[in-house]
Design a protein with these regions (language model features):
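Ser/Thr-glycine-rich phosphate-binding loops at phosphate-binding pockets of nucleotides
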Residues: 160-166, 176
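Nucleotide/phosphate-binding catalytic cleft detector across ATP-hydrolyzing
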Residues: 1-157, 172-174
């Protein structure tokens, strides 16, 4: 199953799942509520208090945990849940300004050799993240119109997020 995740500074989003605030709380005991994720002996709940801006999102586990929430939401939204091991391919993005320096580390952060076991809303998930592909964030939006963009000498793609704005300048695309 291919799952695309936008790890925004304000929200984490997938194609079909609900957007979630980029904030998470960790607890050793099960907190009250329905939207509880258990992973590695700890419990996690989403928080309205977003994670402060991080240039490098791989410095701790929080964006990985947010990704588990997003993966579970996307699996459910697509009606693709199975109790067996679910192979997952991730498509992730980085701001164009950070892509060259961080894309390899971002891929390593998500890719796992072993299955990942977690529960969300008291349902057990067994996933194996097989492949991880990282793309410049603004380019994902442009990919939908590459044919049209190839007819102009240059195009400026803007990605306006909750707290940031990124751009990507495309020059002289060749339509094949």
């Amino acid at each position: 199953m291919l799952i695309a995740i936008d790890h925004g500074n304000k929200q984490v989003k997938t194609v079909h799942g609900n957007a979630i605030v980029s904030g998470v709380q960790k607890s050793k005991t099960r907190p009250y509520g329905r939207d509880v994720l258990k992973y590695g002996g700890s419990y996690y709940t989403l928080s309205a208090q977003r994670i402060p801006y991080q240039k490098d999102k791989t410095t701790d586990e929080r964006f990985f945990i947010l990704s588990l929430f997003a993966i579970a939401e996307e699996i459910e939204a697509q009606g693709a849940y199975t109790s067996g091991l679910m192979p997952i391919d991730l498509a992730i993005g980085l701001p164009p300004a950070h892509f060259g320096a961080q894309n390899k580390a971002f891929v390593r952060y998500f890719k796992r050799k072993e299955p990942i076991y977690f529960s969300y809303r008291d349902k057990l998930y067994s996933i194996l993240i097989r492949n991880v592909q990282c793309y410049p964030q603004a380019f994902a939006a442009a990919a939908m119109m590459l044919g049209e963009l190839a007819t102009v000498p240059r195009a400026l793609i803007l990605d306006v997020g909750g707290f940031t704005a990124d751009y990507l300048l495309l020059l002289s695309l060749i339509h094949i």
